[in-house]
Curated annotation (Swiss-Prot):
SUPFAM superfamilies referenced in this protein's UniProt entry, alphabetically: Ribosomal proteins S24e, L23 and L15e
GO molecular function: RNA binding; structural constituent of ribosome
Classification via SMART domains: Ribosomal_L15e
InterPro entries for this protein: Rbsml_eL15_core_dom_sf, Ribosomal_eL15, Ribosomal_eL15_arc, Ribosomal_uL23/eL15/eS24_sf
A GO cellular component entry from the record: cytosolic large ribosomal subunit
Keyword set, alphabetical order: Ribonucleoprotein, Ribosomal protein
Region (Disordered): 154-196
An annotated GO BP: cytoplasmic translation
Keyword Ribosomal protein assigned: yes
UniProt name for this protein: Large ribosomal subunit protein eL15
Family classification: Belongs to the eukaryotic ribosomal protein eL15 family.
């Protein structure tokens, strides 16, 4: 069976050391570090991943690259007296994934658009980069697209902030069912944050 062009691109990203993707990323990230936190890109860096997640090269669809710092929460130190070990500054794990934070920031930057999905494009010791696919739900080309017009319905408004994207559903524990998931539904907060 013959492989498509997208299959070759996907295989290249799976083993970046052997295929030259690592060297290409190393060069690109030098430019990305100088850029702002949210940058609109002309075309996706990983066309195979973008197409698999619903990207189409048409009006009403935008791809932005978002830079988010790595690691746990940057909690501020307490002003009140207590010993350092009890300040709760270090080793604070976030309740959201970095990918989910990237989606929310992209949505805030483009308030007239909705997040379709996102994917990883690179990381170094300090930052991670994700490309977020955004759709304009009121654009005629989206409304007339039978595979994407579901996002124009009112129920999908603000889907990234409500954890309805793929990264959001995963972070809320909705990928699992059965034993061990009793506290995941109806939501994490409904069960006093005992789900995670």
């Amino acid at each position: 069976m013959t492989k498509s062009m997208y299959a070759y691109v996907r295989d290249a990203w799976k083993i970046p050391d052997d295929t030259g993707v690592k060297a290409l990323l190393w060069e690109r990230m030098q430019d990305w570090r100088r850029e702002g936190s949210i940058v609109r890109v002309r075309r996706p860096t990983r066309i195979d991943r973008a197409r698999a997640l619903g990207y189409k090269a048409k009006q009403g669809i935008v791809v932005v690259r978002v830079k988010v710092r790595r690691g746990g929460r940057r909690a501020s130190r307490y002003v009140r007296g207590r010993r350092t070990a009890r300040m709760g500054v270090n080793r604070k794990t976030m309740g959201k994934s970095i990918q989910r934070i990237a989606e929310e920031r992209a949505c805030r930057k483009y308030p007239n658009m909705e997040v379709l999905n996102s994917y990883w494009v690179g990381e170094d010791g300090r930052q991670k980069w994700y490309e977020v696919i955004l759709l304009d739900p009121h654009h005629p080309s989206i409304i007339n697209d039978k595979t994407l017009n579901w996002i124009s319905k009112p129920g999908h408004r603000g889907r990234s902030e409500r954890g309805l994207t793929s990264a959001g559903v995963k972070g809320r524990g909705m990928r699992r069912r059965g034993k061990g998931t009793e506290k995941c539904r109806p939501s994490v907060r409904a069960n006093a944050n005992r789900a995670k």
